[in-house]
């Protein structure tokens, strides 16, 4: 052996030197100081830009109160900010297409969460723990032949 280890201290130093560091997430912003992310839910796809501001949310060039009339959907969109304790600190501009209103609200929430982590990487653990960064992969089950719907059978008559 060319090199021998004399004590346990040297062994622990070698271990820490060889251990790879956890991946460091960097701030990802464009020249306008905006973070961009895409969010998906069911059939809906949202393109989201966030920038520091007064908390104004615009969806498809309309106010969030106009586009998402139901309070539950607006609450869904605000969840990432409230969990990260950043309510009213960022302006959100997003375009969303496909699916229904519930899927679109979920897609916007997913996009906002991802954009927040690009803007402030230290929020990643909080949002990940809340489940905002994972893509909800549940989609509508396909219709099968020989059935009325995905699982419902045609009416059965015994005689």
Swiss-Prot record:
Q: What is this protein called?
A: Small ribosomal subunit protein uS9
Top-rank taxon: Bacteria
Is Ribosomal protein among this UniProt entry's keywords?
yes
Q: What is the lineage of its organism?
A: Bacteria, Pseudomonadati, Pseudomonadota, Alphaproteobacteria, Hyphomicrobiales
Q: Might you report a single GO cellular component term?
A: cytosolic small ribosomal subunit
Record keywords, A-Z: Ribonucleoprotein, Ribosomal protein
**Is this entry keyworded Ribosomal protein?**
yes
**Gene from which the chain derives:** rpsI
Checking PANTHER family in the record gives:
RIBOSOMAL PROTEIN S9, SMALL RIBOSOMAL SUBUNIT PROTEIN US9M
A Gene Ontology molecular function term for this protein is: structural constituent of ribosome
Spell out the SUPFAM superfamilies in the cross-references: Ribosomal protein S5 domain 2-like
Note the HAMAP family from the entry.
Answer: Ribosomal_uS9_B (MF_00532_B)
- Spell out the disulfide connections: none
Q: Which InterPro entries match?
A: Ribosomal_Su5_D2-typ_SF, Ribosomal_uS9, Ribosomal_uS9_bac/plastid, Ribosomal_uS9_CS, Ribsml_uS5_D2-typ_fold_subgr
Q: Which GO terms describe its biological process?
A: translation
């Amino acid at each position: 052996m060319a090199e021998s280890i004399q004590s346990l201290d040297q062994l622990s130093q070698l271990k820490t030197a060889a251990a790879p560091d956890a991946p460091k997430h960097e701030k990802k912003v464009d020249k306008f100081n905006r973070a961009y992310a895409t969010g998906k839910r069911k059939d809906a796809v949202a393109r989201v830009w966030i920038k520091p501001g007064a908390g104004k949310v615009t969806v498809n060039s309309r106010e969030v109160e106009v586009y998402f009339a139901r309070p539950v959907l607006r609450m869904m969109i605000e969840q990432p900010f409230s969990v990260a304790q950043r309510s009213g600190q960022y302006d959100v501009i997003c375009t969303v297409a496909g699916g229904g209103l519930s899927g679109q609200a979920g897609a916007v929430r997913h996009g906002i969460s991802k954009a927040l982590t690009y803007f402030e990487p230290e929020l990643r653990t909080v949002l990940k723990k809340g489940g905002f960064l994972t893509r909800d992969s549940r989609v509508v089950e396909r219709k099968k032949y020989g059935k009325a719907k995905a699982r419902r059978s045609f009416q059965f008559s015994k005689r």
